[in-house]
Curated annotation (Swiss-Prot):
GO terms for biological process: asexual sporulation; sporulation resulting in formation of a cellular spore. InterPro entries: SASP_SspH. Belongs to the SspH family. Pfam families: SspH (PF08141). Induction: Expressed only in the forespore compartment of sporulating cells. It is found in: Spore core. This is Small, acid-soluble spore protein H 1. One of its GO terms (cellular component) is endospore-forming forespore. Keywords: Sporulation.
Length: 59
């Protein structure tokens, strides 16, 4: 995924289907400079992590 698209999804305030390693995630924040996204897993909201934006897939 492109960094700008990830940032738009994070700021939209709506649920957009995004996958990371085959699991549904929510993008909380995007660091454009580092090209990293703070995500959490839909089925495990307590599991937050920072991941490279390029590894996210919009469905």
């Amino acid at each position: 995924m492109e960094t700008l698209r990830a940032k738009r999804i994070a700021e939209a305030g709506e649920v957009v289907p995004v996958m990371y390693e085959g699991k549904s995630v929510i993008i909380q924040h995007v660091d454009e400079e580092q090209e990293m996204a703070r995500i959490y897993f839909v089925d495990e909201p307590e599991r937050e992590q920072d991941v490279p934006v390029r590894l996210l897939e919009e469905r």
